[in-house]
């Protein structure tokens, strides 16, 4: 697996952020803890094939088996009962997380049509970043002929940053293409 981003973080990003924010200890420097990739499927309760294809796509993209998320409450308007499958999600940590982030930044995001950079407004106030993707075709692992329907996904990058400024600086140094 590609360790390029991890070594870049340890060798160049940590000293740069330590100097920029005036940290005394390297453990104060913000780092990425985990990345969650989530896909909500409204039709999963009626269509089991959509759930299986989504599981296969997410495991191809992330390299890890996704878990099926189930409805916590029954919602009559959406024809959902408690315990019905409503989506799939993957939590990435460690080496897989760095490999996925590297592929996302360098391969997937530049393949988005009319891409001019991602919004810098999607931070949550605690240094975590959320990103919505409209189609799975931007990942080179997905073959156009094999997909049954274009579906998006939500990607959340959870960091140890104390505020949005630190989180933005960390992701910018990692190469995240902000506008």
Curated annotation (Swiss-Prot):
Any Pfam family the entry gives: Ribosomal_L5_C
Family annotation (InterPro entries): Ribosomal_uL5 (IPR002132), Ribosomal_uL5_bac-type (IPR020930), Ribosomal_uL5_C (IPR031309), Ribosomal_uL5_CS (IPR020929), Ribosomal_uL5_dom_sf (IPR022803), Ribosomal_uL5_N (IPR031310)
Coiled-coil blocks: none
Gene3D superfamilies to which the protein is assigned, alphabetical: 3.30.1440.10
Lineage: superkingdom: Bacteria
Single GO term (MF): rRNA binding
UniProt keyword terms in alphabetical order: Ribonucleoprotein, Ribosomal protein, RNA-binding, rRNA-binding, tRNA-binding
PROSITE patterns, per the entry: RIBOSOMAL_L5
GO BP of this protein: translation
An example Gene Ontology CC term for this record: ribosome
Role noted for this protein: This is one of the proteins that bind and probably mediate the attachment of the 5S RNA into the large ribosomal subunit, where it forms part of the central protuberance. In the 70S ribosome it contacts protein S13 of the 30S subunit (bridge B1b), connecting the 2 subunits; this bridge is implicated in subunit movement. Contacts the P site tRNA; the 5S rRNA and some of its associated proteins might help stabilize positioning of ribosome-bound tRNAs.
Membership in a protein family: Belongs to the universal ribosomal protein uL5 family.
Subunit structure: Part of the 50S ribosomal subunit; part of the 5S rRNA/L5/L18/L25 subcomplex. Contacts the 5S rRNA and the P site tRNA. Forms a bridge to the 30S subunit in the 70S ribosome.
Protein name: Large ribosomal subunit protein uL5
Species of provenance: Microcystis aeruginosa (strain NIES-843 / IAM M-2473)
Species classification: Bacteria, Bacillati, Cyanobacteriota, Cyanophyceae, Oscillatoriophycideae
Gene from which this protein is expressed: rplE
């Amino acid at each position: 697996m590609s360790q390029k981003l991890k070594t870049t973080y340890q060798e160049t990003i940590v000293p740069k952020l330590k100097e920029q924010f005036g940290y005394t200890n390297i453990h104060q420097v913000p780092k990425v803890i985990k990345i969650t990739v989530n896909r909500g499927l409204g039709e999963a309760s009626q269509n089991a094939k959509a759930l299986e294809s989504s599981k296969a796509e997410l495991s191809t993209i992330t390299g890890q088996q996704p878990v099926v998320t189930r409805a916590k409450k029954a919602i009559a308007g959406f024809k959902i009962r408690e315990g019905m499958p409503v989506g799939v999600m993957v939590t990435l940590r460690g080496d897989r997380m760095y490999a996925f982030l590297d592929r996302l930044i360098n391969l997937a995001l530049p393949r988005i049509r009319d891409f001019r950079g991602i919004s810098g407004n999607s931070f949550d106030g605690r240094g975590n970043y959320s990103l919505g993707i409209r189609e799975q075709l931007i990942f080179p692992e997905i073959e156009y002929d094999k997909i049954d329907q274009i579906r998006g996904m939500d990607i959340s990058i959870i960091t140890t940053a104390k505020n949005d400024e630190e989180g933005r600086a960390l992701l910018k140094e990692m190469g995240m293409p902000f506008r």
